[in-house]
Amino acid sequence: MLTWPAPQIPELPGRGDVVRVHDSSTGRLVVAAEGPSASLYVCGITPYDATHIGHAATYVAFDLLGRAWRDAGQQVTYASNVTDVDDPLLERATATGVEWQDLAVEQTALFAEDMTALGVVPPDVYLGAVETIPPVAAAVEELVAAGAAYRVPLEEGAGGDAPALGDVYADVTADSAFGQVSRMDEATMLELFAERGGDPGRAGKRNALDPLLWRRERPGEPAWEAGSLGTGRPGWHIECAVIARAGLGLPFDVQGGGSDLLFPHHEMSTSHARLIGDGDVHGVGAATHVHAGLVGYQGEKMSKSRGNLVFVSRLRAEGVEPMAIRLALLAHHYRSDWEWTDASLTEGVARFETWRSAVSGNGGPDADATLAEVRAALADDLDAPRALAAVDRWAELSLAGTEKPVEGAPGVVSRAVNALLGVRL
């Protein structure tokens, strides 16, 4: 799958600090990646209703992580996916009378346009669910052979030419570490599993929390040949485990996404990753799990199911400067839940115009301290609001003209804002 064009990242003097992030599993700040390299997997979109502000906030947040790593001198490998076949996509295609493939292509392209406009660095490895069906099917077969997965009988009419081959589910009891990512009690897991695409009440399952690995063919649904599994398509969680393994290897440094992915998605995909290693060596998935807060609108979480969405593409079509949108997102710490309002965007536009005016001259206040403050803020759990405040102070002094101007300082600030915050002035 093709990504979008990569923005140019200016060179800055010196090096950034070691980046620490909040690990959702432990609740502690930890070094995001040790050593000269860093690896990141961010769960991608299901391509319908792209790209809303909640999506954008997540991808901008993890774009900051990649930028901070690069500034610290680390070689970054970033992988992501597109879930281009899944129940919600199929349901939307049916409801709107379009082919699901056409909807996926259209929305994936729109997402790429929005990410380009927002200055998000694209993944190095970018794979769709459809193009990775062969390795996903092989991983599911591996789990079945190891006794970590089992079949559940189908309802009448399902299964195509081989109805005796049931759906395949992972047995969560095969993973002794299951639950260590989210650290939730079983009652909470069951509640969230039911809310977020799971099927705890499915007859024939060994455990209510067992997740789907391979869904057999149903009438009117797309399906692919998969050897001993029978025709069908993959479950959601196993896709990410396999794509992360293919793109980054196991283990990798950080798995990121919205906080609503902590359970079941990241718990399940990490569990699968533990069990699909080669031979006796089992991967542990991500060393650190990092989650972005949720964005609300009109008093509720912004979500596709509620339909209360604000789209990046519509804002762009209305003539809103994409960098102002990015600044509106960066005004909130990535882990916080917050509400999108018209005032959020107004503040982003005003900040963008102020910064652009402040860097327009040949001289300005010394930039060294500002660069150091921005670097320190990002190294401290990607504290974008603190970084923005540092640039605000420099801009205020620059526009006031009360300090002796330092030649070249505006250029340093402009390059720093671009390289570290992803804001082109």
UniProtKB/Swiss-Prot annotation:
Name of the protein in question: L-cysteine:1D-myo-inositol 2-amino-2-deoxy-alpha-D-glucopyranoside ligase
One GO cellular component term noted in the UniProt record for this chain: cytosol
Major enzyme class: ligase
Taxonomic lineage of the native organism: Bacteria, Bacillati, Actinomycetota, Actinomycetes, Micrococcales
Organism (species): Sanguibacter keddieii (strain ATCC 51767 / DSM 10542 / NCFB 3025 / ST-74)
Cofactor note: Binds 1 zinc ion per subunit.
One MF annotation (Gene Ontology) recorded for this entry: zinc ion binding
EC number: 6.3.1.13
InterPro entries: Cys-tRNA/MSH_ligase, Mycothiol_ligase_MshC, Rossmann-like_a/b/a_fold, tRNA-synt_1_cat_dom
Name of the coding gene: mshC
